[in-house]
Each structure stands twice: as structure tokens, then as C-alpha cells.
From Swiss-Prot:
One of its GO terms (molecular function) is 2-C-methyl-D-erythritol 4-phosphate cytidylyltransferase activity. One of its GO terms (biological process) is terpenoid biosynthetic process. Residues 1-225 are annotated as: 2-C-methyl-D-erythritol 4-phosphate cytidylyltransferase. The record marks 15, 22, 258, 357 as: Transition state stabilizer. Keywords: Isoprene biosynthesis, Lyase, Metal-binding, Multifunctional enzyme, Nucleotidyltransferase, Transferase. 4-CDP-2-C-methyl-D-erythritol 2-phosphate binds at residues 232-234, 258-259, 280-282, 356-359, 363, 366. Residues 226-382 are annotated as: 2-C-methyl-D-erythritol 2,4-cyclodiphosphate synthase. Pathway: Isoprenoid biosynthesis; isopentenyl diphosphate biosynthesis via DXP pathway; isopentenyl diphosphate from 1-deoxy-D-xylulose 5-phosphate: step 2/6; Isoprenoid biosynthesis; isopentenyl diphosphate biosynthesis via DXP pathway; isopentenyl diphosphate from 1-deoxy-D-xylulose 5-phosphate: step 4/6. The lineage of its organism: Bacteria, Pseudomonadati, Pseudomonadota, Alphaproteobacteria, Caulobacterales. The record marks 151, 205 as: Positions MEP for the nucleophilic attack. This is Bifunctional enzyme IspD/IspF.
Length: 382
């Protein structure tokens, strides 16, 4: 089941302390907003509309660099007006229903929460994740003694909250009771049926300065590191240059293959695909397809990186080993590292390129071909 998303990111977040609004702050190396955008795209969102301020629009291209399937619109003076602006900005193409409204200050959206919401809409007009209240509640009016409040039947509402677009538009149009605290309140007032699904303790809202310290810890819980490895080999043939790790090297032979035979890029592509469970390079670029005859292998690697991004993941580091008697790799190693960093969009200090020989043993030792191995670490949503 497909869906679309409106992420409300137009607030000032003053309770979170001085400095940038909380949705633009960096959490475990990435902007708070990016966490939820990546999660929704990885779960299959047809489109994500980010509702922001005029100042925020300047941040978005940098904050969401490399992500496809999102766009922005300007919000209003209140959350309700911003939600309505986001609903108006959604396309009406197939796959845009239902709509999930989400607060940008809740970075840890899980696939399980999203799927539960989609399933609950078959019997409700709006579904939202919620947690049962576990703490004892106290009420203390000004100047009076504290009183215990029963927590029976009380739930803590979270976002995203899911409903059909026309349901939300009609409910907001009919709302006349001031500023609502969430979308469920608006739909409920319009006579809609509300369903609660299992909430997630990780789906905490960043409101106060101390919340960010806890979120830094939770970020490690909400992400997993996956490792992939790849291997490739090509035989030598007549030629005047060889491509290795995206760099052309003058040589008295070339590597023979269907594409440009860049064994370094092929091994690295396979390692990335392996880390995210997406098969191997032959599945995506079959050697039987004439389209890829003589193709530059950097496009294969970029495709693998795009798949990582689409899953809400990020490359941590890569390590490539070239196995050959010649050409000498050391004079070109830094250029290879820089080219790989450029293709992968990661800092060069996260890229390693090494070379070794097999001491004259085997096909590489006899000078019949060159081999490459690669290992990568990829961070993805848990």
C-alpha cells in the first residue's frame, strides 16, 4: 500500500533552547528532519512534502541532499495552517493516498509504525500511534495541593497520523475551536472514527534541550550497521590504459570486460549491494545487455549508492584492495581515493585503497589478470 507524507517543519522550536530550530539541528551526524524523510522514503512513500519557513527553504537542499521524492512548501503561522498548506501541496497522482501527517521533531519513525497505521485505516477515518501512560499522573492547580489523576484509559498520542486527504481537508475546514493539538482532534470533532495503533518509545518528540541528549543515545538504537563485501576479476588484453577505482592509468595492457572492466568499482558496487541485500552487479546491469557495453562503471557505483539512500541508509566507510603484479598502484592511490569519495559523496578519510600481490602465484601472479576485493560498512534504519 502506498502513501504520501506531510512533514510539519515550520515551527520555531523555542522550548528546545537557543540556536537553530530543532528540525535543523544535527542528531548523530544528520539533521533531525532528514531522519524522518529518509524513513518515509525507505518505507515506500510516493511523495514527501516538507512544510517549512522561508528561511527553512534555504536549508532544505543541503539538509536533504541526495534524497529523491520530496519537495517543500511554505507553512503558516500555526501548525494547523501548516498542515493545511501541506495537504494543498500534495499531488493527486495515484499512490498519494492515504496521507500521513508527521512532526519533524520526531526523528525515529519505524517501518512497523507506518505499516500498522496503513492497516488500521480499513476500519477508521484516522489512525495514530499511541503509548499507554505508565507514570502516575498528578494535577496541581496554582496554589493548591497536588492531586492524583487516574491514568486508566489514557494514551500518549504520537505522529505520524494517517487519514485520507479529503478527510483531513474537510475536517480542518470545519474546525472552529482554536488551535488543535493534533490532527486526530480535528478529525474526531468532525465525527470521524479514530483508531490507536501500537506506539513506539523511540518515537519521542524533541521539545526541550535535555531531549537531544537522550536522542543522541536513541540514535544508536534506531540504526544498525551492515557490512558487505565484494570481489571482481578481469583478464588482461591488448590496450593502452586501464581503469581502476574510477581513474585512468596509462598501461601497456587493458582489462577486458563487457563494461570498462574497472574491477575496483565492480567489487565496491557488489559490496554495497550485498550490505543492503540487493543482489549483485549482474542483477542490475546484466552483461548480456548491449546497453552496458563499454559503459563507465561509475554509474554502477552511483546506482548502488542511490539504493542505499532510498533505504534511508548512509555509507560509513569503504575499503578496496587491488590484487595485481602491475601496474603499480601506489602512485595513483590518492587519486583513486579522491575519485571514490567524489562518487560516494563521503569524506576521503572514509575511503581506503590498498594494493597487494600474490607473490607470483595464481592468475594475478602470472600476469593473466587483476582482481579486486572490497568491504563496506553501511548504516541503515533498524
Amino acid at each position: 500500500m502506498t502513501f504520501s507524507v506531510v512533514i510539519v517543519a515550520a515551527g520555531s522550536g523555542t522550548r528546545a533552547g537557543p540556536g537553530q530550530a530543532k528540525q535543523w539541528r544535527v542528531l548523530a551526524g544528520r539533521p533531525v528532519l532528514r531522519w524522518s524523510v529518509e524513513a518515509f522514503l525507505a518505507a515506500g512513500a510516493a511523495e514527501v512534502v516538507v512544510v517549512t519557513t522561508a528561511d527553512g527553504e534555504a536549508f532544505l537542499p543541503r539538509m536533504l541532499e541526495g534524497l529523491q521524492g520530496w519537495r517543500s512548501t511554505l507553512g503558516g503561522a500555526t501548525r494547523a495552517l501548516s498542515v493545511q498548506a501541506g495537504l494543498a501541496a500534495l499531488s493527486e497522482r495515484p499512490g498519494a493516498e492515504p496521507v500521513m501527517i508527521h512532526d519533524a521533531a520526531r526523528p525515529f519513525v519505524s517501518r512497523n509504525v507506518i505499516l500498522a497505521l496503513l492497516g488500521a485505516l480499513s476500519d477508521a477515518d484516522l489512525a495514530l500511534p499511541a503509548l499507554a501512560v505508565a507514570d502516575t499522573l498528578k494535577r496541581q492547580p496554582t496554589g493548591e495541593a497536588a492531586q492524583t489523576v487516574s491514568r486508566e484509559h489514557l494514551w500518549r498520542a504520537q505522529t505520524p497520523q494517517a487519514a485520507r486527504r479529503d478527510t483531513l481537508i474537510a475536517a480542518y475546514a470545519a474546525w472552529t475551536h482554536g488551535e488543535p493539538t493534533d490532527d486526530a482532534q480535528v478529525v474526531e470533532a468532525a465525527g470521524g472514527r479514530i483508531a490507536l495503533t501500537a506506539g513506539d518509545p523511540l518515537l519521542t518528540k524533541l521539545t526541550y534541550p535535555e531531549d537531544f541528549a537522550m536522542a543522541e543515545h536513541l540514535a544508536g538504537v534506531a540504526r544498525v550497521t551492515r557490512v558487505g563485501q565484494g570481489f571482481d576479476a578481469h583478464r588482461w588484453g591488448p590496450g593502452e590504459e586501464v581503469w581502476l577505482c574510477g581513474v585512468a592509468i596509462k598501461h601497456d595492457e587493458t582489462l577486458v570486460g563487457h563494461s570498462d572492466a574497472d574491477a575496483g568499482l565492480h567489487a565496491l558496487t557488489d559490496a554495497i549491494l550485498g550490505a543492503i541485500g540487493e543482489g549483485d552487479i549482474g542483477d542490475h546491469f546484466p552483461p548480456t545487455d548491449p546497453k552496458w557495453k563499454g559503459a563507465a562503471s561509475d554509474q554502477f557505483l552511483k546506482h548502488a549508492v542511490d539504493l542505499v539512500t532510498a533505504k534511508g541508509g548512509a555509507l560509513v566507510n569503504v575499503d578496496v584492495t587491488l590484487i595485481c603484479e602491475r601496474p603499480k598502484i601506489k602512485p595513483h592511490r590518492q587519486a583513486m581515493r579522491e575519485r571514490l569519495a567524489e562518487i560516494l559523496s563521503i569524506p576521503v578519510d572514509r575511503v581506503s585503497v590498498k594494493a597487494t600481490t600474490t607473490e607470483k602465484m595464481g592468475f594475478t601472479g602470472r600476469g593473466e589478470g587483476l582482481a579486486a576485493s572490497a568491504v563496506v560498512a553501511v548504516e541503515t534504519p533498524a
